[in-house]
Amino acid sequence: MALELLLAMPLVAEVRSLTILHTNDLHARVTALDDGRGGFAALAAVIRKQRAQCSDCVLLNAGDLVQGSPISTVFHGLPVFEIANLFGFDAATLGNHDFDYGWIEARKFIDTANYPIVSGNLVGAGGRLFTPKPYVILRVNGLRVAVIGAMTEELRTLSTPKLMEEWHAVSVIEAARKYAAALHDRTDLVVLLGHINEVEEDRFLSQATEIPVLVTGHIHGGLEHEVSRNGRVLVRVRGYGEELGRLELAVDTEKKAPVSWTWKRLPVDGREIEPAGDVAVQVNRWEDEVSKQVDQPVAVSLRHFESSEIKRLIEQAMRDETGADFAFINQGGVRDVLPKGQLLVRHIWNIMPFDNRVVFGKFKGRDLPPVVLGDQKVDPEREYTLAVSDFTAANQSADEQLRSSGLRFSGDGGLLRDVLVDWFRKKKVIE
């Protein structure tokens, strides 16, 4: 009887410390950016320095580990996961770009990772989960910390349908709240590790009172300061490995929530910290595999180009190289900036890492949406050729005007990044 009474009694409330180190949207940027920031070897060094300073650390990644560098493009992402195993992640979730090579490759990523990859709302037929588990329970500093993975509900519109097949994301907040409720008596804290958009972030902060900590990715710009609401906190750092987040929590085990926290964004710069040698060896090994293919000069840029300007350059290249009257690419398809100076094939691949192909459609002027026309005037009855990527043609999700227009495309104008390389080589100078 005494034992039964003891087991029935609530545990004495304690406040214990927990430090969450976190990354998101690394996008295969294994080498440093042109300004010296980032790079997997420097990021690993920052992570290891931080872990050496605390005994209550966990390391999380909020998705989109691949897609964004030649190593990822050529080898379909697998080497990136192999290198990332050296970071020492305790848990991760998948991002939409982790499916850019198809769901079968994404499964290989899960098998390759030496840490659990979780998602609670990524499902197929009959609701079966894509990942082995929807969550993982980490034990650190006497705390039982549940980490629930989550994918943005926009997944289908952000991916090529044929690469996803049956897999899709169901309501992110309903799935996460379901698992949080089931975990309530088994854990001291629930953390959402989500690759979600800003609307979904806001919905969690407003509605999901049972999930007090959110570590997110998908929006590359990161946050200047943590977002807090009613005792809950959300954090997200800049992508491409430019920053490591450090969230220090004081967790009340009875309330199952933090009573205080501090958050820091730690810069990653190989000029200020000695890069991790073992990671550098692996990065260099794979870089040597692709260097001959991508470290070839294509043109000279007389100034720095931002992504909005590059969108216009890409559309011009598509028109010039294919003879189309109009071209359109969604802004989200531009993945990098162009620096001033010598441009290499690598730079072109970085702005367009996808295996997207150019396709065409012939349409009357009256059927072309304003997003394609801009300020150009057309004859409503004349037929015009419009070039787009096959990604845009497949779901036309990049723009509401295209989606509502119902335009249909066909043909094959080649890989878009090859079209761009040819165009830059012919231009020689970009200004």
Per-segment meaning from a language model:
Residues 12-278, 307-317, 321, 327-329, ...:
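Acidic, metal/ion-coordinating pockets
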Residues 24-29, 67-70, 200-206, 213, ...:
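Solvent-exposed loop/linker segments at secondary-structure transitions
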Residues 1-10:
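Bacterial N-terminal signal peptides
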